[in-house]
Amino acid sequence: MARIKDKYRNEVAPAMMEKFGYKSVMQIPRLEKIIINMGLGQAKENQKELEIAVKELGIIAGQKPITTKAKKSVANFKVREGMAVGAKTTLRGEKMYEFADRLINIALPRVRDFRGVNPNSFDGRGNYALGVKEQLIFPEIEYDKVDKVRGMDIILVTTANSDEESRELLRLLGMPFTK
């Protein structure tokens, strides 16, 4: 079992139950899924770029990502409908907890000049969005084999009803928020 899942069951859930006064164990917010998205503007000219990004995202997530396609044609960006413009993957279950553990305990502390993540990046429905500027913070990516630095969006979707509940859940799981 993932360390973070174990921590959730033994420490986080009882603390949340006490703080918010839930009547049922099922009311306690939990991680539902983690979505990792890589938007690649350069992919329209260079198909190899997309293949490399998909491969790297697969290594980071531990499962094969899908390529995202443009919904509309935009002349200013030279994008036509149906062109591949990025890659994304959705993690659930054990893989989600494993990834959350690696993100919080290994990847985020490796970010240059890291002082914590923004505590205001909640969407109003209890979900947290986080932008990463480079894929090198993940230990699975070998520095020598990287041709280009790519960023990604990581969205942590929770079952929380409010940002306050979600913030407390992530804080108890070990997410390093800035003060």
UniProtKB/Swiss-Prot annotation:
Pfam families for the chain: Ribosomal_L5 (PF00281), Ribosomal_L5_C (PF00673)
Annotated InterPro entries: Ribosomal_uL5 (IPR002132), Ribosomal_uL5_bac-type (IPR020930), Ribosomal_uL5_C (IPR031309), Ribosomal_uL5_CS (IPR020929), Ribosomal_uL5_dom_sf (IPR022803), Ribosomal_uL5_N (IPR031310)
Cellular component terms (Gene Ontology): ribonucleoprotein complex; ribosome
Keywords: Ribonucleoprotein, Ribosomal protein, RNA-binding, rRNA-binding, tRNA-binding
Statement: the UniProt record of this protein carries the keyword Transit peptide: no
Biological process per Gene Ontology, one example term: translation
This protein's record includes keyword Lipid biosynthesis: no
Gene Ontology molecular function terms on file: rRNA binding; structural constituent of ribosome; tRNA binding
Database matches in NCBIfam families: PRK00010.1 (NF000585)
Family, per entry: Belongs to the universal ribosomal protein uL5 family.
Role description: This is one of the proteins that bind and probably mediate the attachment of the 5S RNA into the large ribosomal subunit, where it forms part of the central protuberance. In the 70S ribosome it contacts protein S13 of the 30S subunit (bridge B1b), connecting the 2 subunits; this bridge is implicated in subunit movement. Contacts the P site tRNA; the 5S rRNA and some of its associated proteins might help stabilize positioning of ribosome-bound tRNAs.
Record note on quaternary structure: Part of the 50S ribosomal subunit; part of the 5S rRNA/L5/L18/L25 subcomplex. Contacts the 5S rRNA and the P site tRNA. Forms a bridge to the 30S subunit in the 70S ribosome.
Name the record gives this protein: Large ribosomal subunit protein uL5
Organism of provenance: Alkaliphilus metalliredigens (strain QYMF)
Name of the gene: rplE
